[in-house]
Amino acid sequence: MIQVESTLQVADNSGAKKVACIKVLGGSKRRYATVGDIVVVSVKEALPHCKVKKGDVMQAVIVRTRKEVRRVDGSYIKFDSNAAVLLNKQGEPVGTRIFGPVARELRGKNFMKIVSLAPEVL
């Protein structure tokens, strides 16, 4: 459950390390985002000489949340951290590698590129 001002780890090799959510997309009154949702983020920490730099405003898709997500079979899944993958204007991942596991819900939301790059899909 991600809202405005939430900080997220970045789960790709785009060069950003931490980002802060500045808007949840999907309606004017939408407050929370969960796995598979797109948010607008600002880069708070970044490595030097990389694709993104501190202060960049980008879109990102949430791949892990600490708040559990209920699945249709009744099971729940939750992770140890809140993490996102940065997206470019076309909705494709900026990085070429994904670190850590991602949730299976991304497959249903057509983020197949992220699912194929991820080392583990839970």
Swiss-Prot record:
Keywords of the record: Ribonucleoprotein, Ribosomal protein, RNA-binding, rRNA-binding
Transmembrane segments: none
GO CC term (a single one): cytosolic large ribosomal subunit
Record-linked Pfam families: Ribosomal_L14
Keyword RNA-binding carried by entry: yes
InterPro entries tied to this protein: Ribosomal_uL14, Ribosomal_uL14_bac-type, Ribosomal_uL14_CS, Ribosomal_uL14_sf
Any single GO BP term: translation
Record's function text: Binds to 23S rRNA. Forms part of two intersubunit bridges in the 70S ribosome.
HAMAP family per record: Ribosomal_uL14 (MF_01367)
NCBIfam families: rplN_bact
Family the UniProt entry places it in: Belongs to the universal ribosomal protein uL14 family.
Name used for this protein in its record: Large ribosomal subunit protein uL14
Native species: Nitratidesulfovibrio vulgaris (strain DSM 19637 / Miyazaki F)
